[in-house]
Amino acid sequence: MVEYIKYTPELSGNWSRAWSETQKQRPWQSRRLLDSATTSQLQGKLWLVNELNKLDLKFSNVCLVGGWFAQLITPLLFDNFNINFIHNWDIDPDAKQISYKFNRRYKHQNKYVAITSNIFEKSWSKFRDSNYDLIINTSCEHMYPMKKLKELNPDLKAW
C-alpha cells in the first residue's frame, strides 16, 4: 500500500525551486498553489494509486485530464508503476508552466509533457492520435461528463 510520496533530495530540490519560482513569476497563483498541496489533494492521489495497484494492470502511457500542476500524481505514478510517459492536459496556461517547474526532471528526461487545451473541442486530434493506456481525470467535477469526450473521440483506444 502506498502511503506517501518518496520525498527524495531530487524531489525536494525540484519542489522548493518550483515554489520559489512560482511565487516570483506568477504571484497571482499563490493561493491556487497552496490549494493544490492540501491534505485532501494528497489523500485523493494516494487513494487513486492504491486503487490502480489493486487492478494489477500494466500502464505505460498516461493521460492526465485536467491535471492542474500534477506535482503530486506525477511522482506517485512514476515511482509506483512502470510508466514511460505522462501527458498532462489542462485548460489553464499557468498550470502548464507551473507543472513544468514541479516536474522538470521528468520533462528533461522526455517523460512528461504539459499541454494547454480544452479536451472537449472537436479539433483535439493530438488526443485521438495518442496511445494512452490509462486516462486519469481528477478534475471531472469541473467538467462536462466524460462520455462527451468519448462522443467527440470515438476511436479512443483507452476507453
For each feature predicted by the language model, list its residue ranges.
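Conserved SAM/SAH-binding beta-strand->alpha-helix loop
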Residues: 90-94
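S-adenosyl-L-methionine
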Residues: 1-58, 96-134, 138
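Conserved class I S-adenosyl-L-methionine
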Residues: 57-70
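Conserved acidic residues
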Residues: 60, 130-133, 155
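A short, conserved alpha-helix within the catalytic core of class I
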Residues: 139-155
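Conserved SAM-binding loop of SAM-dependent methyltransferases across substrates and taxa
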Residues: 69-82
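Short beta-strand element of Class I
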Residues: 83-89
